[in-house]
Amino acid sequence: MRRGRNQSAVIIISTFPNKESIIQNVNDLIIEKKLCACISLVPIRSFYSWSNKLEDHEEIMVLMKTTKSLATKLKLEIARLHPYDVPEIIEVKMNDVSKSYLKWMIDSIKS
């Protein structure tokens, strides 16, 4: 699919057990495969039910900024690399993105 200037931007959100589990793949996702323009890591504390038990874990929320045309490839790559049995992989459309930021994103992920 062509990556033109008329792209819409999305954020792919996922959680990982620690920084090391994502940092080892950042260079590959951004530089080599050019699947996203930027990855932000945010420390969080997650509470969730797993096997009928309440879980409480510190995790890293990962925000990956990319274009709609690359979102599916990026989500497949995250699923392939992810250490969890059931990874959280969410796509959110970015609204009201500045033209300069969108241009930078598109330029950053051009082949």
Predicted regions and their residues:
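Positively charged, small/polar-rich N-terminal and surface patches that mediate targeting and assembly
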Residues: M1-S111
